[in-house]
Amino acid sequence: MIFDTHAHYDDEQFDGDRDELLKSMPDLGVGTIVDVSATYESCEKVLTLAGKYPHVYAAIGVHPDEVGELNEDKIQHMKELCCNKKVVAVGEIGLDYYWDNEPHEVQQKWFIRQLELAGEVKKPVIIHSREAAADTMYIMKNYAQGLGGVIHCYSYSREMAEEYVKMGFYIGIGGVVTFKNAKKLKDVAAAIPIEKIVLETDCPYMAPEPYRGKRNQSSYIQYVAEKIAELKAMSPEEVIAVTEKNARDLYGI
């Protein structure tokens, strides 16, 4: 079944039909979802969702755009939340120089601290990196050794993807791979072994064709699987089966 390794069902875009939608997912071919926090406040929300639905798990972390609100007391509270058996990762954490909401040194400080948190609680990490390739790689090489995890919504070169794979990380691929202009990501998807790829939505964002621009949901991963299958001369069913196993290995589910 489909394993959505990165979703945001706590987002307000789902306020009108969240319960109905999440309950329907197994009937739509979706076996497992990891709901990923982006703000400190959403850490509690993703855990509540994970507690309510057997097929939903949680990741605890603060997105680089939101790290200005962090302090050590909040990190300690996040550490306590990570003890819950439904928490499978620390994330999403990283660097975002595209939006540049926080100074680079502030982003880097809290990225490193959350990598340390992952080491303390022995969880893999979900990495967000946008227009920050070199700094992300430098920090990962120095602070993420042995953690394991996924480079979410991968957007860099094939060579850098291969480097992350050598470091023990999976490459997260979502709806962008279905876009006509996504040549670089298609090259990455074709080159990286299927055993090192996991599928994701980033819903409600990043919907694949034919739903581009609409609200995304986990069942739409079928379109991502079909595109990767085409690039790799596999069947979509094989892609879904292998990436589900990869995700279970990644998150220890």
PLM regions: where:
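Mid-domain alpha/beta scaffold segments of enzyme catalytic cores
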Residues: 1-253
